[in-house]
Curated annotation (Swiss-Prot):
<dbReference type="GO" id="GO:0051539">
    <property type="term" value="F:4 iron, 4 sulfur cluster binding"/>
</dbReference>
<dbReference type="GO" id="GO:0009337">
    <property type="term" value="C:sulfite reductase complex (NADPH)"/>
</dbReference>
<feature type="binding site">
    <location>
        <position position="193"/>
    </location>
    <ligand>
        <name>[4Fe-4S] cluster 1</name>
    </ligand>
</feature>
<dbReference type="InterPro" id="IPR006067">
    <property type="entry name" value="NO2/SO3_Rdtase_4Fe4S_dom"/>
</dbReference>
<dbReference type="GO" id="GO:0009055">
    <property type="term" value="F:electron transfer activity"/>
</dbReference>
<dbReference type="GO" id="GO:0000103">
    <property type="term" value="P:sulfate assimilation"/>
</dbReference>
<feature type="binding site">
    <location>
        <position position="189"/>
    </location>
    <ligand>
        <name>[4Fe-4S] cluster 1</name>
    </ligand>
</feature>
<keyword id="KW-0408">Iron</keyword>
<dbReference type="GO" id="GO:0046872">
    <property type="term" value="F:metal ion binding"/>
</dbReference>
<keyword id="KW-0560">Oxidoreductase</keyword>
<dbReference type="Pfam" id="PF01077">
    <property type="entry name" value="NIR_SIR"/>
</dbReference>
<dbReference type="InterPro" id="IPR011808">
    <property type="entry name" value="DsrB"/>
</dbReference>
<feature type="binding site">
    <location>
        <position position="188"/>
    </location>
    <ligand>
        <name>[4Fe-4S] cluster 1</name>
    </ligand>
</feature>
<comment type="subunit">
    <text>Heterohexamer of two alpha, two beta and two gamma subunits.</text>
</comment>
<dbReference type="GO" id="GO:0016002">
    <property type="term" value="F:sulfite reductase activity"/>
</dbReference>
<dbReference type="GO" id="GO:0018551">
    <property type="term" value="F:dissimilatory sulfite reductase (NADH) activity"/>
</dbReference>
<dbReference type="Pfam" id="PF03460">
    <property type="entry name" value="NIR_SIR_ferr"/>
</dbReference>
Length: 381
């Protein structure tokens, strides 16, 4: 067989070498004014909800308009955003980590025209396509996971309850009346690919029943040892069962050990865990990532279970709106939701909000590392 050279020359190992096949370098996408003043900014201000101004050492100013957007978008919607960016922003726009979109302009005339254009664009039903807001002491856009549209283990939907919640708190998205920012996040199950456990308000889908076992198909669809190994609590074990006149290899589950995580279903399609009666959500509050005033902290469960109520999830949205209203009426300025709860005490939190306290809310997690490792920049040697 003839040797076919790949073009590699051992005497010149770096010749024609491709060292980066990922996304292009980020600074290639900067608007000209951002590229000019990169690393040389003096300060920024929030002029009004959804509108920011950054001032550079050179005196240049950048006006940013933040609009709420869906996490799952149609191609036509994305093209419309690109058309707006072409018209006002030289073809530049920016997606934020909370599913917002930011348009940046360099003068007040363009800012005014951009805001008027965004406010004029509406869906057929009358709702705004590009609502301006999500800055400062208000409710920003919701970060969420996949939900029923894609994932195989969700205990609740993502896009459905997120839409319903944002409709309920939309006034706070477009205003800054709250004591401090409120971050709301949603995860469809406790595997939490969206990481909502450090949010002011976190919604987490939970299963309450162990997986159902399709014994007839288990051995045909699954690698049983893999399903057994996937269980973090050793609740899954191999077994044999007689079905009709034949004995089959299958799986047994110790219900008292199951934590309803759905890992076994990921490994074995014959172990579906979704259940219309058992699935629902919990509400967690008090988390944050910021180091301001107090250290970062995890959220705590304050509502142990709310059933799924599609398409508008009325019990969930009503409870979240109520928590925000009580927080707004009682917290100090700049005080995050968790800081307010810790200042007044969690007993007082439940008293003010009227939420029911039960043994399901008691945090029994114990890990010495969590209490001994440094968790923030707030320490002294």
């Amino acid at each position: 067989m003839a040797f076919i050279s790949s073009g590699y020359n051992p005497e010149k190992p770096m010749a024609n070498r491709i060292t980066d096949i990922g996304p292009r370098k980020f600074d290639e996408f900067f608007p000209p004014v951002i590229a000019k003043n990169f690393g040389s900014w003096l300060y920024h201000e929030i002029l009004e909800p959804g509108v920011l101004m950054h001032v550079a050492e050179s005196g240049d100013k950048v006006y940013t308009v933040r609009v709420g957007a869906a996490r799952l978008m149609s191609i036509t919607h994305i093209r419309e955003m690109c058309d707006i960016a072409d018209k006002y922003c030289g073809g530049h726009l920016r997606f934020t980590t909370r599913n917002n979109v930011e348009f940046m302009v360099a003068d007040e005339a363009s800012l005014k025209a951009l805001k008027e254009d965004l406010a004029s664009r509406k869906f057929d039903g009358g709702s705004l396509k590009f609502p301006i807001g999500g800055t400062g002491a208000g409710v920003s856009n919701i970060v969420h996971t996949q939900g029923w549209v894609h994932c195989h283990t969700p205990a609740t939907d993502a896009s459905g309850p997120v839409k319903a919640i944002m409709d309920e708190v939309f006034e706070d998205f477009q205003s800054m009346r709250l004591p401090a920012p409120v971050r709301i996040s949603l995860a469809c199950c406790i595997n939490m690919c969206g990481a909502v456990h450090c949010s002011d308000i976190g919604v987490v889908g939970i299963h309450r029943k162990p997986p159902m076992i399709d014994h007839e198909w288990t051995d045909q669809l699954c690698e049983i040892p893999l399903a057994v190994a996937s269980c973090p609590t050793a609740a899954v074990r191999p077994t044999k069962l007689e079905i009709g006149d034949k004995k089959v290899n299958t799986i047994a589950i110790k219900n008292e050990r199951c934590m309803y995580c759905g890992n076994c279903y990921t490994m074995c399609p014959a172990l579906p865990i979704s259940d219309g009666e058992g699935d629902g959500v919990v509400i967690m509050v008090g988390g944050k990532v910021s180091n301001r005033i107090s250290m970062p902290k995890f959220s705590k469960v304050v509502v142990a279970y709310i059933p799924n109520e599609p398409p508008r999830w009325p019990s969930l949205t009503k409870t979240i709106k109520h928590i925000i209203e009580v927080y707004s009426a009682n917290a100090y300025k700049y005080e995050r939701l968790g800081e307010w709860a810790e200042r007044i005490g969690w007993e007082r939190f439940f008293s003010l909000t009227g939420l029911e306290f039960s043994h399901h809310l008691i945090d029994d997690f114990r890990d010495p590392a969590y209490y001994t490792w440094r968790q923030s920049t707030q320490f002294k040697f």
